[in-house]
Amino acid sequence: MPKTQYIAGVSGGPDSMLLLKLYHKKIACVVHVNYNKRTTALRDQKMVEEYCKQLKVPLIVHTVPEDTVWKKNFQAQARKIRFEQFQKAASLYKVDKLLLAHHRDDFIEQAKMQLDARKRAMYYGIKTRGELYGMKVYRPFIKYWKNEILALCEEHKVPYGIDETNAQPIYKRNQVRQEIANWSKEEKEEFYIGVCAMNRVIGQKLFSLMKRAKQWLAHPDVRELKRYPLPDQRQLVYSFLITHHIDVTGDKIDAILDFIQPFQQKHYRLKDEIFLSIKDERLTLLYKS
């Protein structure tokens, strides 16, 4: 039986370089994106190139043109570029699994941003496993704190670069990261445990509802949906989208319910090129290129 193979996203930072070191025998191809946004970008690219060569792992480097016009939300635009490259590599190597190096500090950072924004999420933080853009995503480092990863890098003599912009409060995520950096180990642990407890409650409610609503999920009739209490409607719409590998926030689900109620609009945009529509009183997805 062939070994499980992955595409791996490697930036050159300690997290992803350790991922490359520990999983290189299972990696079909590494993808590195050079955004040309900072002076050390080429340094990180060369570091990834040299380490992939040393470990004998195929590498695809995507260089974003220097004259690229970046939108206000750079991080969202950069993420889209990354995943487009992951998809291309996955198609080329006929692999549907993606390895990413998010760790527990990333988890609490994401959860805090969600809570600070008062977003009603169906999951807080970052999932260890999930599906995005048609790929099965695995994040094996969620169980490790950042300082543990740095210690492992030293232990395994893993080279890495530090993105100096992470310390600059130029993005909301960076500001949250700096705030969390001042927390004690006990404060981080307490926050993490609290978020996990919230996720368990949400998951239990969702599991219970899905057991009762299998028939609706198979035939998502909007008239039947409206017979459920509003909290259940939100969970059902979320379940419908998750079965189609589309993950959205609680706020977006509320907007979807608003779209469903009057039947005034033809389509609701979920993500790039993916739209929600109502056909014969049933929810359906449209994919437009």
Curated annotation (Swiss-Prot):
Function: Ligates lysine onto the cytidine present at position 34 of the AUA codon-specific tRNA(Ile) that contains the anticodon CAU, in an ATP-dependent manner. Cytidine is converted to lysidine, thus changing the amino acid specificity of the tRNA from methionine to isoleucine.
Organism: Mycoplasma pneumoniae (strain ATCC 29342 / M129 / Subtype 1)
Entry-linked Pfam families: ATP_bind_3
Entry GO CC: cytoplasm
Record's comment describing the protein's domains: The N-terminal region contains the highly conserved SGGXDS motif, predicted to be a P-loop motif involved in ATP binding.
Subcellular localization(s) per the UniProt record: Cytoplasm
Key words, A-Z: ATP-binding, Cytoplasm, Ligase, Nucleotide-binding, tRNA processing
Binding site for ATP: S11, G12, G13, P14, D15, S16
GO molecular function annotations of the record: ATP binding; tRNA(Ile)-lysidine synthase activity
Superkingdom field: Bacteria
SUPFAM superfamilies noted in UniProt: Adenine nucleotide alpha hydrolases-like
Gene Ontology biological process: tRNA modification
Protein name: tRNA(Ile)-lysidine synthase
